[in-house]
Amino acid sequence: MHPRPHFFSYAAVLVVFLAVTLASAQSQPRPHTKVVALDRAENGILPILTGPPETVTMKSGYVVLEPGRSVGKHSTEHHEEILIVLEGQGEMRFRDGSRLELRARTALYCPPETEHDVWNTSAETLRYVYVVANAQ
């Protein structure tokens, strides 16, 4: 009995598909190590990691807030977020009215789907690093 002609057609298509998929996967840039100086974000945000292809899923930034300033309300959406406070004091304010104190050498965690804002409530500059990663 001879194999059906369609079998060879399907097999050829499958081989081509696998070859293209493998070549595409190998051509995707892979994350690599890097160093970012945290000295250019005066009165703002300096992106440290901007996500794929620079990382797998992670994004981060260095934030500098002058007294009385905030970053603006935003949500973590489908990300987890951690803030590492380097210098200064402030508050993380949540939609429900609750607040967490920020101060130097502390870290704060925000789970996914958390609306929040960061305020500098002191008379000195607030500096922190945030890191977000996909929680799904």
Question: Where are each of the predicted segments found?
Answer:
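Extracytoplasmic
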Residues: 57-60, 80, 113
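N-terminal secretory signal peptides that target proteins for export/translocation
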Residues: 1-6
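A short, N-terminal "cap"/entry segment at the start of jelly-roll beta-barrel domains
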Residues: 20-59, 66-67, 72-73, 99, ...
